[in-house]
Each structure stands twice: as C-alpha cells, then as structure tokens.
Design a protein with these regions (language model features):
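Compositionally biased terminal segments of proteins
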Residues: 1-167
Length: 167
C-alpha cells in the first residue's frame, strides 16, 4: 500500500485490530490523503462498527495494546455509548476511535470500503478505508471549511482502481 504513513504505535494497533477481527474504517484526514489530497493531519481516525460483538473485539484489542489497562475505558459497554469518541496520545500521533461519523452510517460506509494491505514488520495486515462516496458524503455533511476544502482535492480516480469489498 502506498500513500499512508503510520507511526510504529499505530502500526502495532492496526495489527492488533486485525488479530481481533475488529470491523473499522480509517476515516478523516488519513482517508483524504489516501484518496489523493496530500495534506497534514494530526491524528488517525478509526470509525468502528457500534455493535456489542465488535465492541468486545475492540476492547480486547485495546487491552492487549495497552498491556491490560485502557485509559478511560473500563468495559466494552463504554465503546457503545452513543457518539463515543476515544482519543489516545497527542498530535501529530493521536489516535481517535469513534462509533459514529456525520452523514454516514457504519453499514453504508462498510459496504463501499476500500480494502488495502499494510506491511508491518511481521507481515501484511488488512486495512479498511472509507470509500470515496461515503467520504464525500461525510465531508459535505460536516460542512466545515477544511472539509469543504478536502472535497475540492480528493480524486475519485484513485479509489476506482482499488478492490472494493462487499459485506
């Protein structure tokens, strides 16, 4: 996979998400970069499926990542709170987890996702990225200046050649 660069911590987290079969999508600035607009971002945004089963998988992955004690998260139920946003670290290496995004449901975004493989020290791991249609819908619904600017520069042709996975 080309175009996205992740810190070692983020790579380790992606590996653990994969190992635990967490359903998530990379959204936000990193998705914008993937879709062709090279710009700065201070975090990596993960949009996870807000189901009980997936929150348990995510909780287990985070427990492993944090060596048994997740900051501010006591149980999988914390991950299911409506509109939950969990932030770890500081910019430029902050990691955000969210169970909803503006203008797009997880089901809708998952159906149009782009599936990539990220090479991490010990092998290749799947990485799901929000597809261009859902990303554009999300950015339009957010309506902030930076989101509207993103819409001017992302390139649909970048994702059209990538393999889209149907659920």
């Amino acid at each position: 996979m080309t175009g996205l660069v992740f810190s070692r911590d983020t790579q380790d987290l992606i590996r653990r998400l994969s190992d635990h079969k967490v359903r998530y999508l990379v959204v936000g600035g990193m998705a914008v970069i993937y879709h062709g607009y090279a710009r700065l971002t201070g975090d990596v945004d993960f949009f996870y499926e807000p189901t009980k089963a997936n929150s348990i998988r995510l909780f287990r992955a985070l427990l492993e990542f944090w060596d048994g004690s997740i900051p501010f998260i006591n149980s999988p139920a914390d991950l299911l709170e409506k509109g939950a946003i969990i932030q770890f670290g500081t910019r430029p290496n902050r990691i955000d987890f969210m169970n909803s995004i503006t203008g797009v449901t997880f089901k809708e975004a998952w159906a149009g996702r782009i599936k990539e493989t990220i090479q991490i020290r010990d092998g290749g791991y799947p990485l799901s990225i929000i597809g261009i249609v859902a990303l554009e819908k999300n950015k339009r619904a957010l309506g902030r200046h930076k989101d509207l600017d993103d819409l001017l520069y992302i390139k649909p042709s970048v994702s059209s050649s990538k393999k889209k996975i149907k659920s």
